[in-house]
């Protein structure tokens, strides 16, 4: 099943794979296992030229995933661990996904209770994942709603929009260092 060798996955199997990929993502976060290193991306196979884009996280540019300083699983663990410092119960409270022949879309309502104030805060994220005929991710795009900036101000002390491949993960690293933690 290697896109560089010309094999393809039939349509029914590709849609089933997209369903599994979305569920792996939602389930890993729902169990709050990502903050402890659980990898939803084990089900995801990335094309070597996979692109990531997000107006909030990377500005107006798309970047190869290989250009990011952290691989996706580690970056996801960093993010979940940092968020859980202030919001120990942070996780999806609503997760929907729609598989298709060329990828899938996910809509997630993330929410948590601020351990210091008892205030519940949350935001929506929307991810669009495009795959090739082999089920390898070729583009991953993330959008979030306006509540996210307020959430980040509390969770990591800074909010975006961020630019480039490292501003956001650098902010996560700083927050972990403040707590004497590493990933």
Regions found by a protein language model. Give the residues of each.
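C-terminal and inter-domain tail/linker signature
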Residues: 2-183
């Amino acid at each position: 099943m290697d896109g560089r060798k010309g094999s393809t996955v039939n349509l029914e199997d590709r849609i089933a794979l997209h369903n599994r990929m979305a569920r792996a993502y939602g389930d890993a976060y729902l169990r709050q296992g990502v903050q402890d290193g659980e990898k939803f991306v084990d089900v995801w196979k990335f094309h070597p030229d996979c692109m990531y884009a997000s107006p909030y996280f990377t500005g107006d540019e798309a970047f190869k995933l290989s250009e990011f300083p952290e691989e996706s699983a580690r970056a996801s663990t960093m993010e979940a661990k940092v968020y859980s410092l202030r919001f120990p119960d942070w996780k999806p409270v609503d997760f929907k996904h729609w598989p298709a022949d060329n990828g899938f879309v996910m809509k997630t309502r993330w929410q948590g209770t601020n351990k210091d104030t008892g205030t519940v805060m949350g935001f929506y994220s929307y991810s669009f994942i495009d795959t090739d005929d082999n089920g390898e991710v070729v583009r991953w795009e993330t959008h979030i709603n306006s509540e996210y900036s307020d959430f980040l101000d509390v969770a990591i002390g800074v909010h975006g929009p961020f630019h480039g491949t490292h501003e956001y993960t650098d902010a996560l690293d700083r927050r972990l260092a403040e707590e004497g933690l590493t990933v």
